[in-house]
């Protein structure tokens, strides 16, 4: 079973994503901010990370930068799920090493397609 870490500060959004992942047969773990997410990623080494950009403690860009700087987490597929839809935001996220940048609102099909493409 593949493990996916969801880093999202909005509880309703986080819980909805967790339910969707569970229904699709993934093991999902969650963090409510970037700092906790970075810690959980280093501890659990998930197969994939879904992360918001704007969050307290540490934003998604900081999480991705931290993950990519550590050998144990550098190659974990990383997808941004965010309301930040400007082309500059997309470009910046991909330049930092994100595997995909999905803007909210997104459909279940879009999310599952991005996950399928990113998972090894």
Residues of each region from the PLM?
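Conserved acidic carboxylate
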Residues: 8
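Two-component/phosphorelay signaling modules centered on CheY-like receiver
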Residues: 11-29, 118
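Alpha4 helix (beta4-alpha4-beta5 surface) of REC/receiver domains from two-component response regulators
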Residues: 15-18, 62, 85-100, 110-116
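Helix N-cap/capping motif at the beta->alpha junctions
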Residues: 30-39, 60
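Short amphipathic alpha-helix used as the core "switch/output" element in two-component signaling
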Residues: 39, 61-74
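Active-site beta3 strand of CheY-like receiver
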Residues: 44-50
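Receiver (REC) domain active-site loop signature in two-component systems and cognate sites
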Residues: 55-58
